[in-house]
Swiss-Prot record:
Pfam families: DUF326
Protein name: Uncharacterized cysteine-rich protein YhjQ
Origin species: Bacillus subtilis (strain 168)
Record-linked InterPro entries: DUF326 (IPR005560), YHJQ-like (IPR044543)
PANTHER family with a match to the protein in the record: CYTOPLASMIC PROTEIN, CYTOPLASMIC PROTEIN-RELATED
Length: 108
């Protein structure tokens, strides 16, 4: 496996962890209605990151397309999470944008 795919795999795993943590923390908030977009995108993002990791590890013929979609979803999740002041949302946004950048490189 090439070096750049290892970096992308690491970014996807980090993003998946950050999204899962953010998802859990958002559900613990007393007022969740303003976090519904964040919660929904955390799930989507964690799922596509897991799929992207699997695609890279198995050298899927659809790896580039999956990584491109992963980048799009990570950007959407990062943008949504970045709207919220919670530390977990800000950390998630950062991980999402890092993952999006790595996945864009893989998809190129």
């Amino acid at each position: 496996m090439e070096q750049y795919s290892e970096a992308c795999i690491e970014a996807c795993i980090d993003c998946m962890k950050a999204c899962n943590h953010c998802f859990t923390k958002c559900l613990e908030e007393s007022v969740q209605h303003h976090l519904s977009g964040c919660i929904r995108l955390d799930r989507e993002c964690a799922d596509i990151c897991a799929l992207a990791v699997k695609a890279m590890q198995t050298d899927s013929p659809f790896m580039k397309e999956i990584c491109a979609l992963c980048a799009d979803i990570c950007e959407a999740c990062g943008t949504e999470c970045g709207k919220h002041d919670h530390d977990h949302c800000q950390a998630c946004a950062k991980a999402c944008f890092t993952c999006a950048e790595q996945c864009r490189s893989m998809a190129a």
